[in-house]
């Protein structure tokens, strides 16, 4: 459990997610056990604690129906495939995986299992994007010929890049700005305007930060 996973757990136990109950959580770090023990659902039920994903899948499968994956990108495929193999639904935080091959493998496993598979792209719920989507679908914007979007709010400081050993690295994250922040923009583009027919990309390295992954996309 990391910072995002902790946030999701608190939202569920607080009753902020309708029809969802937190029945189990995987905690590998000893210092978070006390935090895990404090997780109590609104009905007074405590969440079970497992010390590894392997333990959850092997001994705890009867206590849950779905899995939320909020781990570093490169772990998504393995965890999702194990969950689908156990007949569980999967809600995976973005991105699906670190490369297209892993993402397609996850999609194939989901299809074969017949279970629900969803991705967490929270910006689709922003009121501005919901309104734009409505305007496009209703034809209020006419025949759209060109779209240009520049987003500068995702500039990350060195503190962010150093906040996790897996961040901003090919080994841990699978890339830099494009896979971390840029995917939000790419998701909104295809959600609002459909899939592109052609792509061109320019990805600078070392423009703002001294690391080997892309720091602008």
Regions found by a protein language model. Give the residues of each.
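Residues forming the Rossmann-fold NAD(P)(H) cofactor-binding site
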Residues: 6, 77, 183
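Predominantly a Rossmann-like dinucleotide-binding segment in NAD(P)-dependent oxidoreductases
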Residues: 123-210
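Short, intrinsically disordered, charge-balanced linker/junction segments flanking boundaries
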Residues: 210-217
